């Protein structure tokens, strides 16, 4: 074994934090890199890293006139998405992982992965990345340190997190931090030629909730390697929230201002590729309304001193699905990307050094596709992978709300749950109360997408859009949501109202009934007017839906019949849904809160009464 003192840079740490120094030394001794570098987050470091990555063939520098200071990466074709089947929650007690997670005993997983890590950084540089999720000025800053052998990860973490020397300084000598260890698992023998996207066919993304550790091996893809994102901000943070009385959620946060100048904040949980980023950056189509962005993917929510639920976005960047993002669907995202300073992965490359993906208008006559092959409009395959990504600073978003920077967050007035369903689910439904809202979230369902590897188009339950991200037993997670509703000392008026939306309902011919995108502002308007007590709703067995004339559809190319079908609660479709929900709830055994069974029974009774 190589003694740690022989690793270049190991004794040049810019910190005296004893726990951090001991951990870095331990990992260097285990993984035997050629040298250790502490990431400082500087512009000079970004230039050096991106130059090295271009020279290695991992990145291609884009046309600076089109995308200044931006780069393009192609991954190995086997390393393109989160790998849920290789993602583990290694709680001490298997019951704490629950039926929705893969589990392995922590000691066994650490034995297995320690052997994988042994010598895995040979021939490479080990980078130490101090980072903070959320504002470092927060009352309780949420620090992490990622160790990685991937310079692509270092460059991406600079976009996605607050990181570097200023974070290390803020940590001082004794701050707690989440230990996040990552390796691509591709050691280099002396003289061995590297590949442009090194990775390993053996992959593990393991979380140790009790010790707040993340160990990732074998994948360079963002969701598996940018450990501040899903791994820390959702899986580990959800456990922290359970223990400390707050929520870590897969939610956008937006600020909406009415024509009268009244301000509201809405959080929204949607499974991947269901329009979350598009909604977060909405351009309202109705006069006088204004939307600003606070976050597009993750919300941490805590009660404030006034008893209301406040949300912060812990991220510093946007890691969005590229296909389907265009000037029609999300002009603000396109404006953000045009400002540069971004990394694009697995999209297509134009002949003039720009990027392209499906949805961006007429395809060029020639592209180089995400696999590096020539592509023309006659090609059989898509030019860009369905889960291709852009990674860009959120501070470049032209409609970023100033409140984004507030370490105390913003008070949430409404929570949306939404999935992709072609039938059954109306355009918008208001929950009767908090517990009913938890029921709606717990039974959220969507047709699967390409954001995770596996079958596409299958309806699966995705509770609170958190199925792949709950770091503990989902039954306990539902209970935690219910308990959070008691945090206002009995004053439920301080809790956010809960809504279930579905932009994707289709008519008998298979066409979308609702135009979506900017027109979704019309649904937000109805929600705001409900909060203000000004909009009418009709009580149905599943909750409150807009009255026929309550939704502002002026100027829309929709018939009254289209609107009726979009809002319809079909009793037979809902009765068909009941056994599916029953089967879902049974997965959780005695961990499922009894009040959710009671909600299901009450729904069944209301449907039966309606059918008579």
UniProtKB/Swiss-Prot annotation:
GO function term, MF aspect, one: phosphoenolpyruvate carboxykinase (GTP) activity
Its EC number(s): 4.1.1.32
EC main group: lyase
Residues reported in the UniProt entry to bind GTP: 273-278, 389, 420, 517-520
Residues involved in Mn(2+) binding: 230, 250, 297
Pathway where it operates: Carbohydrate biosynthesis; gluconeogenesis
Compartments in which it is found: Cytoplasm
InterPro entries assigned to the protein according to its UniProt record, in alphabetical order: PEP_carboxykin_GTP_CS, PEP_carboxykinase_C, PEP_carboxykinase_GTP, PEP_carboxykinase_GTP_C, PEP_carboxykinase_GTP_N, PEP_carboxykinase_N
Function: Catalyzes the conversion of oxaloacetate (OAA) to phosphoenolpyruvate (PEP), the rate-limiting step in the metabolic pathway that produces glucose from lactate and other precursors derived from the citric acid cycle.
NCBIfam families: PRK04210.1
Protein name: Phosphoenolpyruvate carboxykinase [GTP]
Organism field: Salinispora arenicola (strain CNS-205)
